[in-house]
């Protein structure tokens, strides 16, 4: 089983606010993204791949105004985006790195590894959308309650089809240099990471937090989640 960081998830109060944050913080304008009718969200994307982080990208995601998710209550949006406290924080403080997604070539086995550690990562949903570069198809783990788990430190898991979105993204001038993950149960997380073949990220004991270091046109930038 091979697993690696796929993308970082920055949740924004609106997509316009997310674009402005990206330009102000990282010095670049994000590329186009898409809509997620099932979740009632939309995004903008940009490539951040670097040594050890092949095909990695940054996702800026927000609830799409005027839409109703096809995923009806009691099912909730992914990434805790129906969590009132979390979204209140995002609206008060602006876009934030709150989660990440890891891609794997054996999603069902990786989910079983989560379950073995007592983490219900949720079922695998099948999804697809057409893009100029071809049909994107993927399977992604989403809990019915939409929770990220472990304050976002445990990644959502994804398995892509033949086409990966980063292959069609132009170079952005950004490079992911380091991904640091902190949690009181870091030892168990490291054991899980070893079991699913996840390399390239660092696990540290401490309050739950994510930290990504990127090289940008503005110099080195540290993106971090609130502890």
PLM region descriptions:
Residues 1-5, 11-29, 41, 48-227:
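Glyoxalase I/VOC metalloenzyme domain signal
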């Amino acid at each position: 089983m091979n697993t690696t960081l796929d993308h970082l998830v920055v949740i924004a109060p609106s997509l316009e606010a997310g674009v402005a944050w990206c330009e102000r913080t990282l010095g670049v304008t994000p590329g186009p993204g898409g809509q997620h009718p099932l979740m009632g969200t939309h995004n903008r994307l940009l490539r951040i791949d670097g040594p050890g982080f092949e095909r990695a990208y940054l996702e800026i995601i927000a609830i799409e105004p005027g839409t109703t998710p096809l995923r009806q209550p009691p099912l909730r949006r992914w990434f805790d985006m129906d969590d009132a406290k979390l979204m209140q924080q995002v609206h008060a403080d602006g876009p934030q790195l709150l989660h990440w997604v890891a891609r794997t070539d054996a999603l069902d086995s990786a989910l079983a590894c989560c379950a073995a550690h007592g983490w219900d990562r949720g079922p695998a949903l099948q999804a697809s959308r057409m893009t100029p570069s071809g049909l994107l198809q993927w399977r992604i783990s989403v809990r019915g309650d939409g929770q990220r788990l472990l304050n976002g430190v445990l990644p959502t898991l994804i398995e892509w089809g033949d086409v990966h979105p980063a292959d069609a993204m132009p170079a952005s001038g950004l490079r992911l240099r380091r991904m640091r993950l902190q949690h009181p149960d870091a030892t168990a997380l490291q054991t899980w990471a070893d079991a699913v073949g996840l390399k390239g990220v660092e696990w540290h004991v401490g309050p739950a937090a994510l930290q990504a270091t990127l090289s940008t046109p503005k110099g080195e930038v540290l993106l971090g989640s609130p502890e």
